[in-house]
C-alpha cells in the first residue's frame, strides 16, 4: 500500500472515530426535552398543583420518571405531596374548543376543515374527560356545554355556520368564566383565521380573567401567516403567539386539512400525557405576595421553566391566632388617635359657646304701606 493510500485510510478511520464519539453528545444536546408549566392550581392553597408538559423537538409528549421533575418556589426546593403522570395518568381533562365562525371562515372551506379537525380532537377523549364548544363572530355562542358525550359534541360542531366579524377576545373571556369553577386540568384551544376586530376585551383582560385554579390557552392559526396582503387570509400571528406564551399553551398554524387535524390530535396527546405535582407551599398564608416557580429536569441540560403565581388575599392572613388580639389593640389605638382630637375639639367649642352671652333677639320691623284716602 502506498504511503498516500495509507495516510488516506488513517484519516478516514480517524474521522469515523471522531464522529462516533461526538455524535452521541450532539444527539443528546439536540434531544433535550422541553419542559413547560401549563397550569398552576392554587384553589386549595396552601396546597398547590402544578401541571407540566414534557415534549420533544416535534412537540410530542416524552415519558419520564416524574421524580426527575425538580420544583422550586422562591428558591426553596419542594418535596411533593403527590405526583401524577407517566404510569399514574392524570384523572381527567376539561377542554373548551373556541372556534372562529366569522365570515372569512366561509372561504376556501375553512370552516368545514375546522369542523373535521375539532371532531378528531373529540374522538381522542378518554373516560372522565369532558369538552365544550364555544363559537364566535360578532357574537359569542355557547354551542355545547361541557359534556362527555362525543356524539353530542359532534352534532354541535356540525351546526356551526360562518358569518360576520371576529370577537376572539370576548369569546375567550366567556370561556375562562365558564371553566373557572371546574376543578382539575383544564384548557382552551382557540382556532381563528384572522384578526380580532370587534372585541370589547383585549389580551390583558383574558389573562387577568384566569382565576386561581388556572388554565392554559393554546392557539391555532388557520391559513398562511406570511400572507398579510388579503384581509381574509391574514393571521394575527404575534397576538396568537403572545396569548399562548402568557397562558401556558402553545401556538401553531396549519395550511391544510390534514395539518390542522394533526395539530388538534397532538394537542390532545400532549395534555393527556402531562405530569401533575401537588405540594404544600412553604409560605402557607394568603399574603398577596407573588411566588416564583421554577421547574427543571434532573440529569439533563434542559432549560429551566419559570412561572409565577399569587395566592391572593386582600387582607393578609395571620398565622398565630394570638396575634389577632395584638392586631385589634393596635387598630383600636389608631382609631382613638384619629377620633379623639375631633371629639376634644368639639367639646372645647361647646364650652366656649356656653360662656358667651347669648345675643338679644331683635324683633322684626314690620313696615306697613300708608293707606291712600
Per-segment meaning from a language model:
Residues 31-96, 101-108:
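Acidic, polar low-complexity linker/tail segments
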Residues 45-49, 64-66, 90-96, 116-117, ...:
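Extracytoplasmic
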Residues 350-373:
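Cytoplasmic C-terminal tails of single-pass
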